Amino acid sequence: MATIFFADPELVIGHGRRVLFVNPDDLQLFKEIELPPDLATCGLKVADSKEQHCQHEQQDVAAAGSAKQSSNTASASASKAKAIEVSIQNVSYSPDRQLLAITTTGGQKALLLYRSRMEHARLLSVRPLARASSALRFCSDGSSVLVTDKTGDCYQYDCVEVEAAPRLLLGHLSVVFDILWTDDQQHIITCDRDDKIRVTNYPATFDIHSYCLGHKEFVSGLALLTEQHIVSSSGDKTLRVWNFIEGKELLIHQLPAPAVRLQVQQLEPEKVYQVAVLFYDHVDGVAIYRLERSSGDNWAITATTVVRADAGLWNICNFTLTGNRVYVTGAENECLAIKAYDIGSGETSTSVPDGWVKMVLRGLEAEGVAYLPEDLSVWFKKRFDNVSDYLERKKRRIEEQQQQKCG
């Protein structure tokens, strides 16, 4: 998975085992992070005895195979390295930009915490994850970070006691796609594949404060607007604004296609926002909406800008906004591709220096390397029409009974 986001003044791009921090104005490289192929070399410990036992069994099998086939030692080593090689899943900055969190997937699932500076980043801890992460979010003061996984569990990791064990806070029955933590740290807001938005009290996370219900498909993204309001995007082709304290829907805006990514920028505090949505399988790649609050709970979409982003010609997976540009990542000719478009015109940005994309791909060690993006079609619910089959069988049974009576 390729992750990309803008944290002023840095454009952050993560892929494989590398994260690049780029100045979006002059596109110069601030710093970079490279993870080792084996996280055990930088402090990763086995999560539990069961996992350790499995790891020992794998080592025994590898050793036995090596003893039987000494001529294939190099091949066995390569296979082992491939089995444990990690890949970056999520990257997130703390609000003050002092900490950086990275989660990995692949052979070793872990949370890596860094102390970040403009020119470098220093590794603080490496903690194992039970499952692959799906979302990542720091609290407002950066003292802890929330990690959700593919099974719907949400864990809190301490960023002061960096080696402390995680605390299980809450759980969903399906994968959590996004998570918010309010600035006052009183509420944790999560959304999942089962079209639910849940508002949970903190620290008493056994107490659910409210639900924001109305979406008919997966809720792909959330963003805080004010102390009481959030915006959500969904696969049901809607963008909605909520008063999450009351669990009340305030605005529903129809989209031309399912929304799979959401980005929000504040233009005027608690009043005007730029809301960008990445569409799934649509002729337009990205739409940018101007969301305005007139008073209280009154919200409206007042303008729309479309960035086609050559949709349909390549597999778009992620995007971010950087003021006057939209940066989009995806797969083109089965390789990772990064493209920049001007928000105003929606066309390919002419101000991006020639060769910049190649430089970034080279820095990510992704140039010419096969890239398989996430299959977003699995996010949609699988529906089975059992009623039609039942009615058809019932109809045939009645017809057979009538024929028997006539006979």
UniProtKB/Swiss-Prot annotation:
Family: Belongs to the WD repeat TRM82 family.
Keywords (A to Z) from UniProt: Cytoplasm, Developmental protein, Differentiation, Nucleus, Oogenesis, Repeat, Spermatogenesis, tRNA processing, WD repeat
GO CC, any one term: nucleus
Main location, first listed in the record: nucleus
Gene: wuho
Presence of the UniProt keyword Nucleus in the record: yes
Localization, UniProt: Nucleus; Cytoplasm
Protein name: tRNA (guanine-N(7)-)-methyltransferase non-catalytic subunit wuho
Swiss-Prot/TrEMBL GO biological process terms: oogenesis; spermatogenesis; tRNA (guanine-N7)-methylation
Oligomeric and partner information: Forms a heterodimer with the catalytic subunit Mettl1. Interacts with mei-P26 and weakly interacts with bgcn; required for the function or formation of the mei-P26-bgcn-bam-sxl complex. Interacts with nanos; may be involved in mei-P26-dependent derepression of the BMP signaling pathway. Interacts with Myc; the interaction may be mediated by mei-P26 and may be involved in the regulation of ribosome biogenesis.
Pathway noted in the entry: tRNA modification; N(7)-methylguanine-tRNA biosynthesis
SUPFAM superfamilies, A to Z: YVTN repeat-like/Quinoprotein amine dehydrogenase (SSF50969)
Chain's role: Required for the Mettl1-dependent formation of N(7)-methylguanine at position 46 (m7G46) in tRNA. In the Mettl1-wuho methyltransferase complex, it is required to stabilize and induce conformational changes of the catalytic subunit. Required for binding of nanos mRNA and repression of translation by the mei-P26-bgcn-bam-sxl complex. May cooperate with mei-P26 and nanos to derepress the BMP signaling pathway. May cooperate with mei-P26 to suppress expression of a subset of microRNAs. May cooperate with mei-P26 to regulate bam expression levels in germline cells during gametogenesis.
Lineage: Eukaryota, Metazoa, Ecdysozoa, Arthropoda, Hexapoda
WD repeat feature ranges: 83-124, 171-210, 214-252
Free-text tissue specificity from the UniProt record: In testis, it is present at high level in hub cells, a niche for germline stem cells of testis. Ubiquitously expressed in all testicular cells throughout spermatogenesis. Ubiquitously expressed in all germline and somatic cells of the ovary.
Miscellaneous remark of the record: Wuho means 'no progeny' in Chinese.
Domain of life: Eukaryota
